Amino acid sequence: MKILAYCVRPDEIDSFKNFSEKYGHTVDLIPDSFGPNVAHLAKGYDGISILGNDTCNREALEKIKDCGIKYLATRTAGVNNIDFDAAKEFGINVANVPAYSPNSVSEFTVGLALSLTRKIPFALKRVELNNFALGGLIGVELRNLTLGVIGTGRIGLKVIEGFSGFGMKKMIGYDIFENEKAKEYIEYKSLDEVYKEADIITLHAPLTDDNYHMIGKESIAKMKDGVFIINAARGALIDSEALIEGLKSGKIAGAALDSYEYEQGVFHNNKMNEIMKDDTLERLKSFPNVVITPHLGFYTDEAVSNMVEITLMNLQEFELKGTCKNQRVCK
């Protein structure tokens, strides 16, 4: 298959070279993020590959349809940037990478929890200013805390296994689909019970219409005073304005955001010399007890390699069978 890969980072190039040969593809790589303005570049190709922050709206999909594109493979698990109704209408088959390295996100989540509970980022900022005092840096020990995991699939399970080594006081979780393996470590509770009982709440659920802004004013009010919130899943699971109010009131002791609801066009881009227009993000950055990372929980050498390989495997399967096990939209 002849493929155009958009938004290719330098760290992906070797994997594309190696796996394109393995799966019999001809792949051209460009750094441009996919969107309506560059969709015309797909002319002459059979399929394209994109990333999760690319703009895959109706306009862009119609343009690649006019270019003859039948297959679209995102190198991510998340697909919230893709207009599925338009893809189906235009006969474009879509596939994703449902699991590239659950360990990468789970390890990062544990790191975020330690960063919050031990105030590591705040301490680092103070040291940069030659402030070596201990005042304001006292932390809490994980073994005295209850962990609440929302979403216990592949990544959530690895998160649970990772925290189990710290001897947490208790581990509880919520998922509409209970994981039998997770039951070896956690007790399943209702969502309200997780909000009420957990000292650390970590999110590992996909974004759906039903859980949009699940962490909002009402749910935060149900939480313990001094709760820590971690989001290494999808940004729009959290209502950012409600989060800010919770931080200002002291209800929330700290938040770690590797995903942010308005991250598209910002995360994974260098904005150092630009005036930031997102006042909400700027307010979140101003809190000393908020850790923001640019959606890099997935970002390990193994995960990047797997993302590229599974993407090219998906496109090979489309070419040979007309369908794919990781297909998200049927023609």
UniProtKB/Swiss-Prot annotation:
Provide a GO biological process annotation. Answer: tyrosine catabolic process
| Keywords, sorted A to Z | NAD, Oxidoreductase, Phenylalanine catabolism, Tryptophan catabolism, Tyrosine catabolism
> Its catalytic activity?
(R)-3-phenyllactate + NAD(+) = 3-phenylpyruvate + NADH + H(+); (2R)-2-hydroxy-3-(4-hydroxyphenyl)propanoate + NAD(+) = 3-(4-hydroxyphenyl)pyruvate + NADH + H(+); 3-(indol-3-yl)lactate + NAD(+) = indole-3-pyruvate + NADH + H(+)
What happens when the protein's gene is inactivated? Mutants are deficient in reductive metabolism of phenylalanine, tyrosine and tryptophan, and exhibit growth defects when cultured with amino acids as the sole carbon source.
**Source superkingdom:** Bacteria
Q: Which Pfam families match?
A: 2-Hacid_dh (PF00389), 2-Hacid_dh_C (PF02826)
Q: Any idea which residues are catalytic in this one?
A: R234, E263, H295
Output the Gene Ontology terms for molecular function. Answer: 4-phosphoerythronate dehydrogenase activity; D-lactate dehydrogenase activity; hydroxyphenylpyruvate reductase activity; indolelactate dehydrogenase (NAD+) activity; NAD binding; phenyllactate dehydrogenase (NAD+) activity
Residues that bind NAD(+), according to the entry?
R154, I155, D175, A205, P206, N211, A232, A233, R234, D258
Pathway(s) of this molecule:
Amino-acid degradation
Q: Summarize the pH-dependence annotation from the UniProt entry.
A: Optimum pH is 7.0 for indolepyruvate reduction. Optimum pH is 8.5 for indolelactate oxidation.
| Function description | Essential for the reductive metabolism of L-phenylalanine, L-tyrosine and L-tryptophan. Catalyzes the conversion of phenylpyruvic acid to phenyllactic acid, 4-hydroxy-phenylpyruvic acid to 4-hydroxy-phenyllactic acid, and indolepyruvic acid to indolelactic acid.
UniProt lists the family membership as follows: Belongs to the D-isomer specific 2-hydroxyacid dehydrogenase family.
Q: What is this protein called?
A: Aromatic 2-oxoacid reductase
**Which source organism does the UniProt entry give?**
Clostridium sporogenes (strain ATCC 15579)
